[in-house]
């Protein structure tokens, strides 16, 4: 089930990556700024590494050979089996999942790319707080244990930048965001920096598969719109699919997925392990 270098998805990924990344960058070894990370940097963060191909294949065995709605349903069944974290527990979890590979005292802020002390979490200016990448008002789940505390879409972010992003959908364009170099925003959308465009896409797509309305929360769905308001939907899907190709999973994102699986929720984001499944479903 591993991705072949000859698949159409991989060919598209390679072409898209050339448009986005400097020639010196390598997928899987990018620092917060998007430049190449030192060799072995991710391995120094934690004993938790990336699962073997065999272990990942076994986890997704029930999805093998499926496409479209059948694949989405199979993945939902697999990933809905999980442990849940409380909203207070998210603070300490993010200090592990988003630890800076180069400084174990810091976390990397998702949109800013800034390395910041773990101890500066809170609600004050220049503190970092808990960003819901799938805006919690889109489906009105708030901070309830479940979608409101799911680590697969919660990331550390500067308080001011988090406020600027608000509950906007994701799309291209806008004005530069202060304290988040490479990010842009306008009245109805937010564009993250290049180094996490794919991360954002895969987090949102995970949420749309994991939460289907069957566990007391809204059925979260993707669409090709912005201005979704309080509807249980996020967009713009066509742009997010491009970002999934342009910014493939790197070592930081893969390690994060593994730590969530090993230590906290015991479920995985399938689109980090198999980014080609995005086009298979959508």
Ranges and model annotations:
Residues 1-11:
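Bacterial N-terminal signal peptides that target proteins for export
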Residues 14, 29-30, 36, 42, ...:
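Compositionally biased, intrinsically disordered low-complexity regions
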Residues 107-109, 113-120, 124-127:
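Short, His- and charge-rich active-site/binding loops that engage polyanionic ligands
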């Amino acid at each position: 089930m591993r991705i072949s270098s000859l698949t159409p998805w991989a060919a598209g990924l390679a072409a898209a990556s050339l448009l986005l990344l400097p020639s010196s960058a390598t997928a899987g070894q990018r620092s917060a700024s998007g430049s190449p990370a030192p060799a072995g940097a991710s391995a120094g963060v934690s004993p938790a590494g990336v699962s073997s191909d065999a272990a990942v294949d076994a986890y997704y065995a029930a999805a093998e050979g499926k496409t479209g709605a059948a694949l989405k349903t199979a993945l939902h069944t697999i990933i809905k089996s999980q442990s849940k974290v409380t909203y207070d527990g998210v603070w300490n979890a993010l200090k592990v999942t988003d630890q800076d590979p180069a400084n174990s005292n810091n976390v990397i802020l998702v949109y800013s790319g800034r390395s910041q002390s773990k101890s500066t979490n809170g609600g004050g200016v220049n503190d970092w707080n808990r960003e819901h990448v799938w805006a919690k008002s889109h489906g009105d789940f708030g901070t309830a244990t479940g979608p409101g505390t799911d680590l697969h879409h919660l990331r550390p972010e500067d308080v001011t930048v988090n406020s600027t992003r608000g509950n906007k959908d994701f799309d291209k364009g806008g004005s530069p965001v202060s304290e988040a170099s490479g990010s842009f925003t306008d009245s109805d959308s937010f564009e993250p920096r290049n180094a996490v465009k794919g991360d954002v896409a895969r987090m949102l797509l995970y949420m749309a598969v994991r939460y289907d309305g069957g566990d007391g929360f809204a059925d979260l769905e993707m669409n090709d719109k912005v201005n979704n308001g309080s509807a249980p939907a996020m967009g713009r899907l066509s742009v997010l699919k491009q970002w999934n190709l342009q910014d493939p999973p790197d070592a930081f994102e893969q390690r994060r997925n593994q730590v969530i699986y090993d230590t906290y929720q015991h479920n995985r984001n399938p689109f980090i392990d198999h980014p080609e499944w995005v086009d298979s479903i959508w």
